[in-house]
């Protein structure tokens, strides 16, 4: 109930209008909006226009900075059993806070919120929007983009990595960085640190097929011609394995280790063995993605002892002043701690609205010109020949021996 009043209080901080009955009851057994909801971050600013000239076309098309940014937020706020998804409400609350902050900074935002489980049609509300954030699943996005084939509206995929498959054919902006991009970033990183006396060691579990991320890393290593040794064993042999790591390790350089496995217990064992190399007068560094830190039973000290290099889609640096500000404001408004969905809701809305405000109505064509480091995500887009755009932003984390974490 406290969170209910907090959201209503937040809505009083921005101009609010609605064309139909509105219900906002966050929390368990709460109901979401049943019809259109419009939240307006109502701060006026001056506008200006710029011109861009498409290649091969003599007609100049204006990219005008709009007076008001129209955003539709399409979320399944009510599930089919009549309850709600708390994580998606956290995403929604983060987006509301972003709209509030944007309004205070001089960017006027109209935020239309739609419950995709309401059964109501959405096409009329999408008209005139600069972007649609959602739907959540790649399947729902495919249905929506198919409905809007004849329109110029852009869909922003905020959470589902599988929506990357839609980018080649549809007007979709993929904000979660794909595994292939994370793998390329990790191999780029390894390659930049690799010295002649070093050795790359790929460790895998007997009888296991590599997962998607591992396949991408192995493909990148082969593509770049980076040679590597392999070590394959079964987790049941773990007690006999440390000496095999020593045998494969570089004597004078650093052994750079990658675990090509989706098994949590096996990856944990690889981390333990890389950590043990230092007691055998060898130096080892582990390269991985952020899945490793979520494994139950992982000892954080081992991540630091192994001087782990980790690529991450999402990472929150709680020592950052802007994170502290967000957390305190979120606590004050919603009487709870923000989770990763709240950070993502804030980041996605803030980035898209800021891009429109800076790049104008042709923002999607000029997206590579604007990058942003959000609370937990980075947004970097490059020029692409396909229909949509894919975020290339990846955070690189170094677990230092002094138990600090550096972000690159």
Which residues fall in each region the model found?
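Repetitive helical segments and hydrophobic/amphipathic motifs
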Residues: 11-12
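N-terminal signal peptide c-region/cleavage motif recognized by signal peptidases
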Residues: 15-17
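Extracytosolic ligand-binding ectodomains
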Residues: 2-8, 20-408
């Amino acid at each position: 109930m406290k969170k209910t009043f907090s959201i209503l209080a937040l809505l009083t901080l921005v101009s609010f209008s609605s064309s139909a009955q509105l219900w906002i009851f966050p929390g368990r057994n709460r109901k979401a909006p049943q019809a259109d909801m419009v939240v307006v971050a109502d701060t006026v600013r001056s506008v200006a226009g710029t011109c861009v000239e498409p290649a091969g076309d003599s007609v100049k098309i204006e990219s005008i900075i709009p007076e008001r940014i129209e955003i539709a937020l399409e979320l399944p706020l009510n599930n089919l059993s009549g309850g709600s998804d708390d994580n998606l409400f956290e995403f929604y609350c983060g987006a509301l806070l972003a709209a509030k902050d944007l309004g205070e900074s001089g960017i006027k935002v109209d935020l239309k919120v739609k419950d995709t489980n309401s059964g109501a049609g959405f096409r009329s509300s999408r008209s005139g929007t600069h972007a649609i954030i959602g739907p959540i699943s790649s399947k729902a996005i495919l249905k929506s983009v198919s409905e809007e084939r004849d329109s110029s509206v852009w869909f922003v995929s905020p959470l589902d990595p599988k929506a990357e498959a839609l980018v080649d054919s549809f007007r979709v902006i993929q904000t979660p960085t794909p595994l292939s991009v994370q793998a390329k970033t990790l191999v780029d990183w390894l390659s930049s640190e690799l010295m002649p006396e070093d050795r790359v060691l790929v460790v895998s579990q007997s009888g296991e097929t590599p997962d998607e991320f591992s396949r991408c890393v192995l493909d990148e290593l082969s593509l770049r011609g980076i040679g590597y040794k392999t070590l394959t064993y079964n987790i049941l042999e773990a007690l006999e394995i440390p000496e095999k790591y020593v045998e494969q390790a570089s004597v004078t350089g650093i052994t750079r280790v990658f675990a090509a496995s989706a098994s949590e217990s096996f990856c944990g064992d690889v981390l333990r063995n890389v950590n043990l190399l230092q007691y055998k007068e060898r130096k080892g560094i582990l390269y991985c993605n952020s899945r490793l830190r979520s494994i139950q039973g992982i000892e954080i000290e081992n991540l630091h002892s192994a001087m782990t290099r980790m690529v991450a889609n999402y990472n929150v640096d709680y020592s950052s002043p802007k994170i502290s500000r967000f957390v305190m404001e979120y606590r004050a408004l919603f009487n709870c701690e923000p989770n990763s969905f709240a950070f993502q809701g804030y980041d996605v809305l803030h980035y898209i609205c800021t891009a429109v405000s800076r790049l104008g109505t042709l923002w999607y064509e000029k997206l590579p010109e604007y990058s942003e480091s959000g609370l937990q995500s980075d947004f970097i887009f490059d020029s692409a020949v396909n229909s949509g755009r894919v975020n290339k932003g990846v955070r690189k984390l170094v677990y230092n021996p002094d138990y600090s974490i550096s972000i690159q």
